[in-house]
Amino acid sequence: VLEHLKTIYLRTLDACAPELLVRAAITRDMPRDVVAIGKCAGALRDGLDDVDDALVVVPEGYRMAVKRSRIAIGGHPDITAGSFEAGRKLRDFVDARDEILFLISGGGSACVELPLAPWFDERDLIETNARLVASGLNIGDINCVRKHLSAIKGGRLAARVKRSVTLVYSDVSTGALADVASGPTLADITTKADAIAILERIGGCDQIIAKLRDDECPETIKRIDDSRFALIADNHTLVAKAAEIAAEIGLMPVVVEQQIESEIGDAARELLDRAGRLREGEVLIAGGEPTLVRRGDGKGGRCIELAVRMALAEGERRSDKRRSDSLVRLPVDSQRKPSDWRVRPTSIAPKIHALLGTSDGVDGNSGVAAIALTLAASIDREVAERELLRSNSLAVAEEIGETIMIPPAGNNLRDLYLLACT
């Protein structure tokens, strides 16, 4: 079963390659000067042929463009000095042109940046971004704040040119295209008041809040003239392709239509509950990005920690079932002693098999792309819970499952979850 799940996962990544999907979205009337931003920037650029000039802005360690391009390399998930250097190159490239085709993918929020001067400086952005990433906030709230501190997010980049077309390869919630890379080329509906409220919730950002309250500090861009945008692909594309491939290899796909975006413990229980209702030959296919709070300096990621939490929940469920099934008192006279109770064989619970994988090939700081495991495997609860407290889920995952490593895939459509029962 796990081999089938691996096949679905790897074939799905190949089928959703950005260079394949972007070609289908290109029309002849689009600008021939190109800016590609994010984890998929190199692959998106390579999907285009008829280009006059191109700037590719990509996080360090991700796929570069093969075709002729200018290159700028920034940081991820942390904003680095390279991110600001990439921001300056981007600003200069855009300011020298009237019309630009923007290819936007996730990861752009950190890998390219410029502070909104004079209100914010580079240190403000680095420190605030680090606090946001560690906060457990959803990506929409994180990017709301990022937009209001940046000179190139929240529509401000597209506002620098006369005409723009934006194609989005989305790693965010369905329909939230302005959150991809913090929406550098799309009009923004959030306000400074929204950003302030978010910062007040996480605390420790009084100086940033004070600067945002300055009446001279501008709002993000609410309207962009002569600008249009379209979606290339998102998590639903990934899930739909996985379902198609599952059917091709003889399995019955059971698709979860809504993305999994809850707290990671809740996400583990939801997936486990859904998987427990599967029949043999069916495969549950879901996608999304649960929220995860970074608690320490260990190694792990969303998919790895989700696997550990599912294993813990399954172990608890099986333990409860054994206790409830193990003894039955016979319905006879009340004089019988507990020693007269009879043991009833425990019913055999189905084994749940899972593959939980990233689409970009990088799960947090774990160095792996995905994990495949059978949830009936034993897990040391005390050790697992201790390691989770310091975000060191990888150490536990390697004991209960098979970690899968692939080169950075060039994709970035959130995560893919595949589960089956035997």
Residue spans for each PLM region:
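Accessory alpha-helical/coil subdomains and C-terminal extensions
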Residues: V161, A187-A267
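Intrinsic disorder/low-complexity segments
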Residues: G315-P350
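A glycine/threonine-rich phosphate-anchoring loop and its flanking beta-alpha core
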Residues: V133, L137-L199, G203-G204
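Glycine-rich oxoanion-binding loops at beta->alpha junctions
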Residues: P59-A96, V145-R146
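Internal helix-turn-beta structural module
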Residues: V308-G315, P350-T422
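An N-terminal, well-structured beta->alpha segment
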Residues: V1-V35, A43-L44
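A glycine- and small-aliphatic-rich helix-loop capping segment at beta-alpha/alpha-beta transitions
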Residues: G47-A54, R68-R70, P115-E127, A159-K162, ...
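Gly/Ser/Thr-rich active-site loops/lids in small-molecule metabolic enzymes
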Residues: W119-G136, D188-G203, D297-G315, P350-A354, ...
